[in-house]
Amino acid sequence: MTVRTRVAPSPTGDPHVGTAYIALFNRCFAQQHGGQFILRIEDTDQTRSTDQSEQMILDSLKWLGLTWDEGPDVGGPHGPYRQSERKGIYRQYAEQLIEKGHAFKCYRTSEELDALRAGLKESGENRALKPSDLELPADEQAKREADGAPYVIRMRVPTEGRCEIHDMLRGPVELDWALVDAQILLKSDGMPTYHLANIVDDHLMEITHVIRGEEWLNSAPKHKLLYEYFGWEMPVLCHMPLLRNPDKSKLSKRKNPTSILFYQRMGYLPEALVNYLGRMGWSMPDESEKFSLTQMQEAFDIQRVSLGGPVFDVEKLSWLNGQWLREQSDEQFLDSLLDWAFNRDYAMKIIPHLRQRVETLSEVADKAAFCFNGMPAISEASFEHKQYSADDIKVWLQYLLWTYEARNDWNREGLFADAKAIADALEVKIKDFLFPVFIAIAGTSASFSVVDSMEIIGSDISRARIRHAIEVLGGVSKKQMKKLEKAYRDLPVG
């Protein structure tokens, strides 16, 4: 048997360090066993998936050295490797389940589903919706079918008993069938959900080991059941502990920069970031803190993974990155510096905005410094405004941060539209509203267009700088945050 592992990111935003973390452990496991590592793109969410995001994922993983044997860019015998290009395959298997009596068409409306869930809550029943709750009387089913009403395909699940899952790290895990819902397999637009697509793809792509985040452990009974329904052998499951913020909460962009691009633009070495991710819940046999990808692959043993939630601490990553930098030769350091600071693609984004604003090349370093720096050197005094207080400005920035955190695509038109919508809702002139954004992003209001600047430096650095500015202005307490969240929800935006 050839060991085959995979990573299957969704191209719905910036490439996440969590994707790199899972890719790293999948790649190391495959390498350890002389196997193959596959990259598959989960782009079934057509409203949020973008080609730009997919390319950033590919570029970021390559930058880290986490290359793959098969994937959408390199091809392979099990393609296509984008789920959107496999739509017909999923429908074929979903209909096969209906024919075998393992799935059914569900014509329930969203209002009916809400009422069913409310009924369960009122009755105090601690269980999920089951086929018996969802199936309509035969005459009503026939009527909706004849009317061409939209439907989804759901799987049948047991109503009682327990399901035992074997996990490589945890051993046997028991889960209650009562809490497992009649999962949607095929949506009304014909696209599959994660649950159907991954089982079908993992089988057809001959995946032998599924190494994924522990958030999928509760879904494992559905997956085991689908393998049984199809009569397929189930891959070995291994659920990795989730990355955590220093406060032990799940790693999220609201508390920590999560984009690989952020760390690339901030000047972290790819070797250091891979090294740090390798220490997330795993350790070398000799307990060494600094090691290369090659060294990790040679010493890798999945059983050395600890189930305690590994903490992703940027300060510790910075310390480790410093260790890597200090051990470089002068030539290596110069090469790293030139590759980072004079990256041609990045520089070409800046130059069109810079060329019109300088008279000598010696001015470039000062005017473009914010494109290369970390956090701008700002104070509360930097935000002084004739008409608005620091508290006013702090609220604006918090509203803008929340809006930008919800944005999937990152372009100047969308960024400006978001800022304008909030300014209009607050009845603030856009010029006044953008003043503190200039300060937060560039450290000065004497810069080229702030939306152009944010598009250039990217989403994670932009959000991190706005978050930093809010802290400089005194931050927001938990009590204030609740009030602001309500006020933000009530904003007449859009």
UniProtKB/Swiss-Prot annotation:
Keywords, comma-separated and alphabetical: Aminoacyl-tRNA synthetase, ATP-binding, Cytoplasm, Ligase, Nucleotide-binding, Protein biosynthesis
Motif ('HIGH' region): 9-19
The reaction(s) this protein catalyses: tRNA(Glu) + L-glutamate + ATP = L-glutamyl-tRNA(Glu) + AMP + diphosphate
One Pfam family recorded for the sequence: tRNA-synt_1c
Principal localisation: cytoplasm
Ranges spanned by the short sequence motif 'KMSKS' region, renumbered to the chain: 250-254
Keyword hit for ATP-binding: yes
InterPro entries in UniProt: aa-tRNA-synth_I_cd-bd, aa-tRNA-synth_I_codon-bd_sub2, aa-tRNA-synth_I_CS, aa_tRNA-synth_I_cd-bd_sf, Glu-tRNA-ligase_bac/mito, Glu/Gln-tRNA-synth, Glu/Gln-tRNA-synth_Ib_cat-dom, GluQ/Sye
Entry superkingdom: Bacteria
Localization of this protein: Cytoplasm
Cited PROSITE patterns: AA_TRNA_LIGASE_I
Molecular function terms from GO: ATP binding; glutamate-tRNA ligase activity; tRNA binding; zinc ion binding
Entry keyword annotation includes Ligase: yes
Task performed by this protein: Catalyzes the attachment of glutamate to tRNA(Glu) in a two-step reaction: glutamate is first activated by ATP to form Glu-AMP and then transferred to the acceptor end of tRNA(Glu).
Family to which the UniProt record says this protein belongs: Belongs to the class-I aminoacyl-tRNA synthetase family. Glutamate--tRNA ligase type 1 subfamily.
Record's subunit section: Monomer.
Name this protein carries in UniProt: Glutamate--tRNA ligase
Organism: Alcanivorax borkumensis (strain ATCC 700651 / DSM 11573 / NCIMB 13689 / SK2)
